[in-house]
Design a protein with these regions (language model features):
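A short acidic, amphipathic alpha-helical/loop segment
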Residues: 113, 135-140
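Positively charged, amphipathic N-terminal segments that serve as targeting/anchoring signals
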Residues: 18-21, 26-127, 146, 163-170
Length: 218
């Protein structure tokens, strides 16, 4: 019961603080859909409940976003229980894994429906990059979008768009898990993502972590 109350208060506080309410959040994992849901926002992005697992492909997708959003999905044989499709563009093919969809028709319908809602004047890029190399983190930082953040395991103080979990208890690929306050706080909530959505500036969430070493906050 206490956990439920705390989660409710966190969501209420975040919704109260949110001023930027028509942004399109482009992500490489399911993190975007969770954030939209917790903020009670309409999905203004096609990258909901799906993922682009190859980091280089995600960079290409973001770098040429208008081009790839203009392309139809081409579904390919999948070894998993969920559909997999490609966006076959002039800059290379992008493979999209529709992890939380049951059929190609469902995946295609939702992708097409949501990509029509994309706000080209309010694009935010958020990447789960805790297994990225330093070179890949720097490649992300070079993307043309002004508002972008990559979540990493370790500190990269010289990369303005990098935000690190930097917690000894954090394990790779757990960014969506509840790992703090007796399984009440998700790991990504250590980042003040509402402030990031509002301002484009990256900082720690002072509610859950007062100070982190070697982090330049904005």
């Amino acid at each position: 019961m206490l956990r439920k109350i705390i989660r409710h208060l966190i969501h209420f506080y975040n919704r109260l603080r949110l001023r930027n309410r028509n942004f399109s959040l482009i992500t490489n994992t399911c993190i975007g859909g969770i954030m939209y849901h917790e903020l009670k926002m309409r999905f203004l992005s096609p990258t909901i409940n799906c993922g682009i697992r190859d980091h280089e492909e995600f960079f290409t997708f973001c770098r040429h976003l208008d081009h790839y959003l203009s392309l139809p999905l081409q579904f390919i044989p999948s070894q998993w229980k969920y559909p997999v499709a490609e966006l076959r563009g002039k800059h290379g093919d992008i493979k999209v894994y529709f992890t939380h969809y049951h059929s190609e028709d469902e995946a295609r319908t939702k992708w097409e429906e949501r990509k029509k809602r994309v706000n080209p004047d309010n694009i935010i890029i958020l990447m789960d990059g805790d297994n990225c190399t330093t070179r890949q983190i720097e490649s992300f930082n070079a993307l043309p979008q002004q508002r972008k953040a990559i979540i990493t395991m370790d500190e990269h103080p010289d990369v303005p768009s990098a935000w690190a979990v930097a917690d000894p208890n954090y394990k790779q690929a757990q960014i969506l898990e509840y790992g703090l306050w007796n399984q009440t706080i998700r790991w990504y909530e250590l980042m003040d993502y509402v402030h990031f959505f509002n301002t484009g500036k990256i900082r720690d969430n002072a509610l859950f972590r007062l100070k982190k070493k070697n982090r330049k906050t904005a």
